[in-house]
Amino acid sequence: MKTRIHKILADHGIGSRRGIELLIRQGKVLVNGKQASIGQLVNENDIFEVDGRFIKLNKKTPNNKRVLIYNKRVGEISSRKDPEHKKTIFDALPRLKSGRWVSIGRLDINTSGLILFTNDGVFANDLMHPSSSIEREYVARVHGQVTDEILKKLVNGVKLEDGLAKFTDVQSGRKGNTNQWFAMVIMEGRTREVRR
């Protein structure tokens, strides 16, 4: 049975449908040695090459979804490839027999915390999409005094360069002499949103 290339590769954890479409546009996806086209119909018996790597599809269990929780430390890079060729968290993940790990969100190099990974690109995209309404909880240390008025503004919304940002919940935690900890919940995952 023929299936669109985006779906079959996403179902086997190669990436999200949009990510696969971008790779196709960049000419980085081959089917049976020929450049793939967007919307192309394929089947699991075809030979796939993605970004210079041959991909073996698992015909028995295409929806053998795996999810992994990774505790990222400060200083680790959470993108798949680093321009300076430093190791990334993808290098520390267990090898998959087929497909690849897709991160569900990212944390910048100066942030530590849990990141989810899956081999199911559609599942990853569903979780990351704003319509999923999934809460993301962060804990941050803030230097200086944070007033109730500031906390109210954070819940009501603060205008950033890329639009309005707001926390759905902010809870104060442990206080020090010059800083205080806060637990914050947001419903989206924009770049460095909590830090900003």
Question: What are the residue ranges of the model-derived segments?
Answer:
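Basic, flexible Lys/Arg- and Gly-enriched helix-loop patches that mediate nucleic-acid binding at interfaces
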Residues: 1-196
